[in-house]
Amino acid sequence: NLNEKQLFLFKKTSELCKKVGLNSTEIALYESDEINAFATGPSKSKSLIAFSTGLLEYMNEDEIEGVIAHEIGHIVSGDMMTMTLLQGLMNTFVMFAARALATVIDNYLDDEDSGFGGLSIWGYWILVWVLEVVFMIFAYMLISWFSRKREYAADIYSSGLVGKDKMISSLESLKKSVNQILPKENKRDSIVFSKISNSKKIYFFQTHPDLDDRINYIKNN
């Protein structure tokens, strides 16, 4: 049997989805203490929004509504498919660029006595691997930058759908949750902590902007 908050979640998600024309979006609830939600699926007509039980227990109805609208924003904008295509494109680019540059370096170092060019066959493939690692770091930075832009856009969409106050309240609640719920030793591996960490050392690899930045962005737009 569903409790009061679970009934609210399913009813409100269905209501907001229908309001924006997402009549076939599925709703799921999964067991986890973490406060988390995500949208997935290949298209608007084949999409799913999943919520953790921890989110329901920690957030009030207004905050939950802000989260629902944020995830709907990702679906309406087609972010899941866009991110999948971008990641595929970046992977292809990394493999091609690494081999192309390794070949250029190999030819540059070429000498007449070497049957493999300037590098041995093992040297060539080790160089390819090193270049792939380097290029992948930059590719992931680009993917993370794009993901952060999509998070800002989903926040604005949510603000337009249910109001700025509810979206801001959701973010403020998420911000408070880490120190209150997660023990210190679990923060490093936490999905939630990875979304809200304010560490400038890893900022360029974060898929989500800092929560303070998101809150200010909503207030100013």
Annotate each PLM feature.
Residues 1-34, 40, 92-149, 175-180:
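Hydrophobic or amphipathic, alpha-helical segments that drive membrane association/targeting
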Residues 84-88, 129, 182-186:
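Residue-level recognition of transmembrane alpha-helices
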Residues 19-46, 115-119, 144-145, 158-221:
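Active-site-proximal gating segments in proteases and membrane effectors
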Residues 62-63, 124, 202:
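Alpha-helical hydrophobic/aromatic positions enriched in membrane-embedded helices and signal peptides
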